[in-house]
Amino acid sequence: MIPVKGVAGQNVAVLGLGRSGLSAARALREGGAEAICWDDNPAARATAEAEGFTCRELTKQGAFDGISALIVSPGIAHLYPKPNPVIRAALVAGVPVDNDIGLFFRSVATSEWDEFDTAPKVIAVTGSNGKSTTVALLHHILEHVGRNSQMAGNIGRGVLDIDPPVDGGVVVLELSSYQTDLARALTPDVAVFTNLTPDHLDRHAGMGGYFAAKRRLFAEGGPDRAVIGVDEDEGLFLAGQLSEGESDDRVIRISARQKLSGGAGWTVFARKGFLSEYRKGRQAGSIDLRDIPGLPGAHNHQNACAAYAAARTLGLAPRVIEAAMRTYPGLPHRSQRIAEADGVSYVNDSKATNVDSAAKALSAFKNIRWICGGLEKEGGLEALKGATDDVLKAYVIGREAAQFAMQLDVEAEVCTTMAQAVSRAMAEAGPGETVLLAPAAASFDQYDSFEKRGEDFIAEVTARLNG
């Protein structure tokens, strides 16, 4: 655990008692504060009270008297589309609002670091798609070479639940826009921006606010090194804002769509399955990504570029990084090949919760029986047009399956449930084809999470193959 600094003797309110909220409450208590907790869910309050925390309704008059700060869980709206009443009450009372990420960055460094031979590093990864894979791949690379590494944030453990970093240790964080938007301190040693596509627009009042939330990771003087995906205009702009000129190698530009100029400082790009690194005009490394089983498709090649670049900032050699990549097993629910039978492959990409990530998943396979649908996100399905050339047929799930199906430019069958979609896709699939779950939508109309949706897909496929 990382005890929170500077809160001894204070009363600090905590809103939201899920994983990050309870983690923050524990770390505040470890730092000498009294955590005053609230969650609208009685079961969540009961869990907190069982750990000895005080729960108190925070919208009542005077609720913030004597409270020094409010710590908010990432799933709770703090501004758009409308502030949560507790957050608004705190702001009216003049109480600072923060989250566990802000607490982490102000508390992780200790006086013990002065005695270390090599100060620990914090690498933070943000972006619309590929964050989890980039973080998991980088963590795997570090473990493969024997570096002490912990991953946390939007993946793995809560940031305050990790062990205090050791001499030479590395903490790899996945940070969502919800987390970067609210954190009062964001000071990583290396910051990574993978890409930007429309997502969570209701929480950020549009693309401008969404980009601004991501961009905050690179403010406050900026990280020592920045790895920036430049395949979208926002990333290209961000790299330009951070760079002092063509020879500035504090910024590493990465791409999975284009060959980057070797003269532009430090670049890493993937073309036709080959990763190339150029530094100050000379090639410094290359990897053939095509036969790495844990990284299928061009979208994973972008993730490979990001993890490779971050690893290089730590001084790891290209050949060592390549050896580690070849043993990377991949993440569940992200281009996860779950079975192959009678020449048909079954792939679970339930994490493809928006149209951009679904389009990238579709580009990685041929002859696709596509299971899609769910809670459609703002922006519609327009971006999928042109990405479905290899789709033989779509099998649409979700409460609004009929409306979803009407927007597709391929033959589509309304199935509604996962069981029906899997049954129909398996019945019609033949050798050389792939049954792919890539929903292009959120899961919350039918499932608690994308993980539950992916697990349902796996269970349906497995039951039929074993039946």
Swiss-Prot record:
One Gene Ontology cellular component annotation held by this UniProt entry: cytoplasm
Name of the protein this chain belongs to: UDP-N-acetylmuramoylalanine--D-glutamate ligase
Record-stated family: Belongs to the MurCDEF family.
SUPFAM superfamilies (alphabetical): MurCD N-terminal domain, MurD-like peptide ligases, catalytic domain, MurD-like peptide ligases, peptide-binding domain
Reaction catalysis annotation: UDP-N-acetyl-alpha-D-muramoyl-L-alanine + D-glutamate + ATP = UDP-N-acetyl-alpha-D-muramoyl-L-alanyl-D-glutamate + ADP + phosphate + H(+)
Role: Cell wall formation. Catalyzes the addition of glutamate to the nucleotide precursor UDP-N-acetylmuramoyl-L-alanine (UMA).
UniProt keyword Coiled coil present: no
Pathway where it operates: Cell wall biogenesis; peptidoglycan biosynthesis
Keywords: ATP-binding, Cell cycle, Cell division, Cell shape, Cell wall biogenesis/degradation, Cytoplasm, Ligase, Nucleotide-binding, Peptidoglycan synthesis
Residues reported to bind ATP: G127, S128, N129, G130, K131, S132, T133
Transmembrane stretches, start-end: none
Keyword Nucleotide-binding: yes
Subcellular location: Cytoplasm
MF GO annotations: ATP binding; UDP-N-acetylmuramoylalanine-D-glutamate ligase activity
Annotated EC: 6.3.2.9
GO biological process: cell division; cell wall organization; peptidoglycan biosynthetic process; regulation of cell shape
Record HAMAP family: MurD
